[in-house]
Amino acid sequence: SAQRRAIAEIIADFGKTHPMARLLEGDVGSGKTLVAAATSYAVVNSRPPNRASGTLQVAYMAPTEILAQQHFESFIQYFKHLPINIALMTGSGCKKFPSKVNKGGATDISRAQLLKWVANGEIAMLVGTHALIQKSVQFKHLALVVIDEQHRFGTAQRRALAKKEVRLPHLLSMTATPIPRTLALTIYGDLDLTLLDEMPPG
């Protein structure tokens, strides 16, 4: 399927000597979030370079709080049976899953607490809005940046997220809309292109 092919291309990029910069393009409902979740899972199951333990981290940036909340909830559904800490950070507040007080659900946490957990590597997947690129957000081992609807974010915002790590993280941008700037980026070699050209079954 197109989704399996996309996942395989992205995971192959992870094995290269230079960081991935890939654009995933597909209509609404074509499975972009599933591809992002599967590749995020591959990342957090890898160890940081030259370390015996620890978790690599993923930052998933959405253009609106509503979309960020939806992606956070999708990730909870995908990973609820696995020992993966997922958090949400937006201008309205912060949440963490799993929760000690809300079995099976997420719990509200303070921004200060979340920043601490992101900095010490306890949070493996951080979903949010442009709040993720504020200077106060420091990752321990940021390995993959996923940007949803990438044409809504400027190049400066992409670079701001990438600069949070000494090693440049992999970049997966996603869009439902083929637009001239996106195509120009691909033509000029800034981003490799993967097309989700078929809908998932069902």
Describe the residue ranges of each PLM region:
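Conserved glycine(s) of the Walker
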Residues: 31
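Conserved SF1/SF2 helicase motif Ia
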Residues: 21, 35-72, 80-84
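P-loop (Walker A) phosphate-binding loop of NTP-binding proteins
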Residues: 27, 63, 176
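Post-DEXD/H (motif II) to motif III coupling segment of the RecA-like Helicase ATP-binding lobe
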Residues: 69-70, 139-144, 149-202
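Conserved pre-motif I regulatory segment
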Residues: 1-25
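Walker B catalytic acidic pair
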Residues: 26, 129-130, 148-149
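Conserved helix-turn-beta segment of the N-terminal RecA-like "Helicase ATP-binding" lobe
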Residues: 66-109
